[in-house]
């Protein structure tokens, strides 16, 4: 049995396909990325907030590490490689393979990462359970427009990620309908996916 994104499944969820038995189990995932989403505090307190993958790793079953990453520009991969993977990852792509996209005034053209501070504007979302920042959502819409107007990227090449469901709604409200091919999701909703450019609203 193969279970993909196994680190996002709680232990009980991962055990369901094993009920009838299996000679071999292959769990595919990364226990250094997002853990399973557990809404119930009681379930979390009961230890149901981790994956079978994580438990087996803690018990000493050594996961096999895929050492070459092909997704990110080397300047972007440097942080997670050093912080989470003890500098064990190698870049299978070069800066030339992942050129800096036109459409933004990059502080450093060779470093395709930019932080844009947006002052104020954070409020509770109308549902009361999340946060949103309409000012930041408007900035995201402007950045998106600049990237697409430059002509190098298609809508499908750009993703917008935010930790908050309320901010997902605020961004969708700010982005013109003509850009409905751009995916806007929460961090959990983007796990395992990739785009040429990610705009992160936090």
PLM-predicted stretches and their roles:
Residues 1-202:
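Conserved helicase motor core of SF1/SF2 NTP-dependent helicases
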